[in-house]
Amino acid sequence: MDTDVGGYIDTHAGEFFAALKQWLTIPSISADPARAADVRRSAQWLADHLRHTGFPTTEIWETGTQDNPGLPAVFAQWPAADPAAPTVLIYGHHDVQPVEPLDEWDSPPFEPVELGGQLLARGASDDKGQVLFHALGMSAWLAANGASAPPVTLKLIIEGEEESGSPHFADLLRRERYRLGCDVIVVSDTTMWAADVPSMCTGMRGVIDAQIDVYGPERDLHSGSFGGAVPNPLHALAGLLAGLHDADGRVALTGFYDKVVELTPAERELFARLPFDEKAWLGTAGNSGAASGEAGYTTIERIWARPTAEINGMWGGHTGPGGKTIVPREAHAKLSFRLVAHQDPADVAGMLRDFVAQRTPPGIDVVVTVDGPGVRSSFSPVDSPAVAAGRRAMERAFGQEILFTREGGSGPEADLGEILRAPLVFIAVGLDEDRIHAPNERVDMKLLLKGAQTAAYLWDELAAAAPDLTGPTTG
């Protein structure tokens, strides 16, 4: 069967890439209100393509409310021949990032170009290419098995607002949770370690964003008349931020680590097996110095498996040319916290407010604003039946051992696992060098075909693992 799947995919690769290029011409930028019609065109294109592939049910689901409308998601369903077969839900997104700065693109971002085995266009890797390989994988499985229905019931939920923070996705999941009910969730919106080092992601960190606004005098004051005698909001803000970490790089919020689960020796060994070149990694950050962070952990462990606090921006007072001798009336900072399994964004928001309240000097008022409910982390144990099935499928497609990674970023995956109460499996073939969110986004065309192979094998592996597919993802 493996040979038949690979042969079908090779034979139909041209058709696959022609369809993908057509989809990539649609500028479905969810963050730009002027592109709302294009996001809708993108949803319609995908629904039509899935219907053409053979999915008997394809629907476009509106999101938001009448007063606060969102952008559409696409739902599709293909029942298994065996009604007792497990149900697999595939998640991805059809919206894309903005393209600025345009002058840094080597070709127009919505005019796909092939170059050296790469397909260049906005959305090629994140996430249209990785969504579409599932349709090719399904066609390959059916052809290789002479079947008219998949071995598992397949459902897809492809959202249209991921790149603008998924503001309506959790509500959509709750509204449609019965139709989206599943035994396993497959996420194809992450990356592998390298083209020649295939890997599976097993978790993503959560995040909350906050702003601290510090207020002092009613107006800017002359520093010669008042400096050193009245509270300075910038001084107060600097003191708060300087106390955010202790001498070992640990976040100083009381209770911040109470629910953090330490890495096991086995997990640390999995990370250590990755061919990580710290010097080269620092080079990609434009930093010729040394890595830093929480003491006692490697760089990989810090960015994947440890919670963090970062100062994202600071401003206040005079920032124009020349001098201006004032005590400013206000100062501001933006912060973000990356969270790991079992940390609740609401709890951390409360810890931040307590931290600030305890350290605010007299004569200063501070307002802490948290941006939305935050995003919980998502994590699937390496030895879980669903992840094991994904590993076997990838190893069949790539013909080599699969390593395990995590990702330091955040997405709506935790909502999927928590609301639908199903384990997550991350099956993706993107690479860090795909330049997602940046000019000249690209995807390795051969890896997309490997993704299609993996998808075809995954349905068999999950069907075989059906008795063990229980239990929600940790978050």
Locations of the language-model features?
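An extended, acidic, His-containing surface patch that forms the Zn2+-binding/catalytic region
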Residues: H52, P83-A85, A194-A195, A252-E330, ...
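A generic structural motif
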Residues: S125, E218, F337-P345
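Histidine/acidic-residue-rich, glycine-tolerant segments that coordinate divalent metal ions
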Residues: P151-N232
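Polar, glycine-rich mid-to-C-terminal structural blocks
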Residues: P217-D220, G224, A229-W281
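A common structural junction motif
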Residues: D95, L244-D248, R353-G363
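N-terminal capping segment at the start of a domain
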Residues: D2-G6, D10-R41
